[in-house]
Structure formats: structure tokens, C-alpha cells
């Protein structure tokens, strides 16, 4: 990693990336976050919670006990801390502080990757979706969903680039409100941005407003939608596109005042998909590709739930839960920075696993192992062309070139 002190331990380097001392001190000073805190300052809290998420700790006592590890204690300059102190601190840090830190870190990732140069033909894609996380209603009364069930919704916008995705914005709500209630908070209004979301955000009045304000979107239409076809556009019969048309949606008072573009295609299993958009400068095939990228936000939710432990929370208040979610996004951005700055081309999961295995070693050793090329290369399992082998053997026999039959080293697979 260029410009980094590789003599430090991987643990030290990770904590420094997480806390970004200059930026964090500036924000803490502006918001007065650490003003009366003596022991567990924000940079240490960030490091502890991030480590707990990466290592899949189950509770506050396990976080507190990890300081018995001399390497962790030394890296944090913290001998011990009580579990209740971690709980109070996590619940008291202003969420605005962590949100601001996340947004600045996200912008740094975007600058490092150079998204404007990697977005390619389809343009600047922003994927929008939500994921519900179940909670125990007796412990999280503020997140009551049903009488016997609690939960929250994590509404998220992520930005697509060639190598993957970067989280862009998050809104946390109780699980009850519909997805479309958070559309205005997540939709990007810049003219070069395309917002991609699923059928849960279908709202004709909202779509008319987006058309008025030249906000671009691509979504999926529900099966029971009322459609009035105005113009049928030409479709390449050799493509996967079945229909491309200009339509009006709804009827009577619910009829949209702006026409939209309707594209019909199929998924990999042959099921019909109807895509709705106000984008006019991309082909139907390109717009189908745009909507296929929406799956990446599902994979992102799965990744952070499995590998950053956002299904289990260390605090019970809404502020503690939201703070932990922001720390998970901050941790993800730090992993993206490590991947980009090190030049590693493998998956983020492989990088994370090696990072955890090398925490107590030097950062230079971690980089060496991360970028090490395999000593042996395998051709894998080969699919044999039995017809070709038979034809070749038959030809040799017919021309009486049969000496090979007495050769114990002969291999008919090597032609």
C-alpha cells in the first residue's frame, strides 16, 4: 500500500484507517463529541465495534474481554473498559457525527477508485433498496412491527463501479413504513445519475414529479398495472427484448401525465420482466443491463449481514442501533480502501479473511501474502472430447500406426 508505514502491525494499520485521526479530530472538535470523555474516545469506540463486527463477537462482554489481548490493548492504548461503558458510549455518540464521517470516507473511496472513469457506457448508476432486520420486540419497543415482532428497515443507496459497489447513503426506519416513503431521501437528482429500484417503490405521482424535474429512474412494473400503449418501437428479433414501447400508466385520476418507456424481456429462467423508465438515450438492451445491476444491492445486504454482523446489535436504543449500522458502513469503506490501495484484484471476502488471519503480524507481511501469486497453477478438471479421441485413435489403427499400443506412457487425452 503506497504511502503507508508497513513496519506497523496489521491491527495498528486497520485502526488508523478506521479512525482517520485528522478527519475524526476535526469532526469531534466541531461537534464537541469527546469534550468530557476521559477514556473511551470516539476513535477507540470505532475500532472496538469494527473489530467486534469483523470478528463476529456476540456481545459487549466479549468486546470488553478482547482487551486482554496485549496486541489489541497496545494498538488502542487502552488497558481495559467495562461493557456498560461501551454500551453507554455507543448509545450517546451523535449519529450525525458517524454519518458525516461515513460520507467523507465514502467520498474518499470514490475519489480513489475514480468512478467517473469507470462507469462506462451505462453511466452513473445508483441502486436503491431496503432490507428488514428482525428484532426482539420486548427489547426494542421503539421498533415494534407487529404485536409480537419488532424490526427495522435499512434503506440504502449504493453506487456501482466496475469492481463492485460503494455504499452512498443510509436511512434507518422502523420496519412498518413502506419503502416508497423514503424515495425522496434516497433518489439522486443530478442529471447524469440513473436511479434503479424495484417494484416496492412504485408511485405514479412521484414518477410524474421525477419527469418534471428530469430525474432519471429505472424500475420494474407490477403485473396488474394498467397500461395504454402509445407507440411501439422497433425491436431486434435476435435480442432478448420482446417489446419496447412508449406508454401511459393508470387511468382516470390515477393516470400519469408523462409517458414512460416500457421494455419487456426475460430473466435467466424465462420469466417475463417488465422494465419501466424515463431514460431515452439508452437502447432497450442497455436498459435491461441497467436493471440487472439491481441485484448487486441484494448481494451487498447479504455481505454486510453475514460478515459485519448487522443482524445482531450491541445496544437497544434506536441511536445505538443506527450508530452500529454506520460503523459497519465505515468498516466496509475501509476494506474497499485497503483493496484499492494495495492493488489486490481478488474478492473483498478473501481480503477480509486474510486480514483477520494476519491481524497480529506486520502490515508488510499481510501485503506480501495478499499479493502473493500462487506457486502452482492448475488446469482444473478437463472436459474430454471423447469423439475426437476415438477419431484420432481409429485413424492411427487404420493407418497401421499401432506402435503406441505397446507404449505404457501413451495417453490418448494428450493429442
Q: Model-found features: residue ranges?
A:
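Extracellular beta-strand-rich solenoid/capping regions of secreted or surface-exposed proteins
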Residues: 143-147
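Single, function-defining residue in the core of a domain
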Residues: 1-62, 66, 79, 90-93, ...
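Extended, structured, electrostatic nucleic-acid-contact surfaces
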Residues: 67-76
Amino acid at each position: 500500500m503506497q504511502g503507508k508505514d508497513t513496519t506497523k502491525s496489521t491491527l495498528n494499520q486497520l485502526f488508523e484507517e478506521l479512525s482517520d485521526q485528522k478527519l475524526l479530530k476535526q469532526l469531534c472538535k466541531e461537534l464537541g463529541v469527546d469534550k468530557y470523555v476521559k477514556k473511551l474516545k470516539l476513535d477507540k469506540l470505532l475500532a472496538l465495534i469494527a473489530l467486534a463486527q469483523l470478528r463476529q463477537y456476540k456481545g459487549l462482554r466479549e468486546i470488553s474481554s478482547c482487551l486482554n489481548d496485549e496486541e489489541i490493548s497496545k494498538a488502542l492504548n487502552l488497558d481495559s473498559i467495562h461493557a456498560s461503558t461501551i454500551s453507554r458510549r455507543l448509545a450517546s455518540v451523535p449519529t450525525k457525527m458517524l454519518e458525516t464521517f461515513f460520507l467523507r470516507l465514502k467520498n474518499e473511496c470514490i475519489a480513489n477508485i475514480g468512478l467517473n472513469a469507470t462507469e462506462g457506457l451505462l453511466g452513473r448508476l445508483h441502486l436503491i433498496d431496503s432490507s428488514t432486520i428482525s428484532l426482539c420486540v420486548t427489547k426494542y419497543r421503539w421498533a415494534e412491527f407487529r404485536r409480537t415482532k419488532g424490526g427495522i428497515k435499512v434503506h440504502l443507496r449504493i453506487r456501482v463501479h466496475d469492481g463492485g459497489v460503494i455504499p452512498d447513503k443510509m436511512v434507518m426506519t422502523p420496519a412498518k413504513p413502506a419503502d416508497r416513503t423514503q424515495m425522496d431521501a434516497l433518489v439522486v437528482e443530478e442529471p447524469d445519475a440513473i436511479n434503479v429500484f424495484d417494484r416496492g417503490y412504485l408511485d405514479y405521482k412521484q414518477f410524474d414529479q421525477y419527469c418534471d424535474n428530469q430525474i432519471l429512474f429505472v424500475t420494474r412494473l407490477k403485473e396488474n398495472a394498467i397500461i395504454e400503449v402509445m407507440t411501439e418501437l422497433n425491436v431486434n428479433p435476435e435480442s432478448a427484448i420482446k417489446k419496447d414501447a412508449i406508454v401511459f400508466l393508470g387511468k382516470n385520476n390515477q393516470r400519469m401525465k408523462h409517458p414512460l418507456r416500457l421494455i419487456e424481456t426475460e430473466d435467466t429462467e424465462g420469466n417475463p420482466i417488465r422494465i419501466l423508465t424515463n431514460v431515452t438515450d439508452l437502447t432497450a438492451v442497455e436498459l435491461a443491463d441497467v436493471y440487472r445491476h439491481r441485484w448487486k444491492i441484494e448481494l451487498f445486504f447479504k455481505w454486510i449481514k453475514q460478515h459485519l454482523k448487522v443482524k445482531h446489535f450491541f445496544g437497544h436504543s434506536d441511536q445505538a442501533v443506527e450508530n452500529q449500522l454506520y460503523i459497519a458502513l465505515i468498516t466496509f469503506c475501509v476494506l474497499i480502501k485497503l483493496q484499492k490501495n494495495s492493488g489486490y484484484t481478488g474478492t473483498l471476502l478473501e481480503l477480509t479473511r486474510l486480514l483477520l488471519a494476519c491481524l497480529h503480524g506486520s502490515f508488510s507481511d499481510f501485503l506480501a501474502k495478499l499479493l502473493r501469486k500462487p506457486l502452482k497453477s492448475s488446469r482444473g478438471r478437463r472436459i474430454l472430447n471423447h469423439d475426437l479421441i476415438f477419431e484420432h485413435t481409429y485413424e492411427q489403427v487404420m493407418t497401421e500406426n499401432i506402435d503406441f499400443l505397446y507404449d505404457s506412457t501413451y495417453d490418448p487425452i494428450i493429442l
